[in-house]
Amino acid sequence: MSDTAASMPYPVITIDGPTASGKGTVAHQIADLLGFHLLDSGSLYRLVALASMRENIDDHDVESLVRIARELDVRFKADRIWLKGEDVSLALRHESVGNQASAIAVHGAVREALHARQRAFLEAPGLVADGRDMGTVVFPEAVLKVFLTASVQARAERRYKQLIAKGFSATVESLSQDLEARDLRDRTRSVAPLRPAQDARQLDSSDMTVDEVVAQVLDWYRQVQGANKAN
């Protein structure tokens, strides 16, 4: 067990990966099964994106974006998210909001403004955090770091099914193009680029079911906890 992990008051599992890799669904199920709190860090960026779009703020207006990030009036409950008292759970899933979130996430000042808010999610008995830099930046001391990937085709098909089920129009081809563009932007940004932590366990979920991925992550967590107790 590392010194940093030993210093954590409660265990943290981070699940990072690109858009539509399934990390959110997996994180939600892991948190439910372990009775841990859940941090969907992507929702925070989407909230900043949605709020900025409603105020007609350009994604290069860093000062205004930081203000929004610091002043977010947000409430999480179960699988619902409220912004200024309005349930925006469905609005946050729109592709335009996701693209805006990816664009503003390149700004270090915005990420810094959300950092303390993300760290505050760590409470007893533990936390499952999903995002793009949970294991590399926000919780580098996590007891288990998972980097979940999948092919662009598999991710586009998953996202297509999700959007159609929620009443949005989309095509697999357009979604594939959007995913490739967002992947490139996330991987090449100068601040907290999308990459696996050095000690992350990588898992390609292209040909796996959600249950199979959840089972693998739980197995890794039990292995880590068993090793920590042995030490």
Swiss-Prot record:
Keywords, in A-Z order: ATP-binding, Cytoplasm, Kinase, Nucleotide-binding, Transferase
Binding of ATP occurs at: 17-25
Say yes or no: keyword Chloroplast present: no
The reactions it catalyses are: CMP + ATP = CDP + ADP; dCMP + ATP = dCDP + ADP
The source's superkingdom equals: Bacteria
Just give the chief location class.
Answer: cytoplasm
One GO molecular-function entry: dCMP kinase activity
What does the UniProt entry say about where the protein is found?
Cytoplasm
BP GO annotations: nucleobase-containing small molecule interconversion; pyrimidine nucleotide metabolic process
Q: Belongs to which family?
A: Belongs to the cytidylate kinase family. Type 1 subfamily.
This chain's protein is named Cytidylate kinase
This protein's gene is called cmk
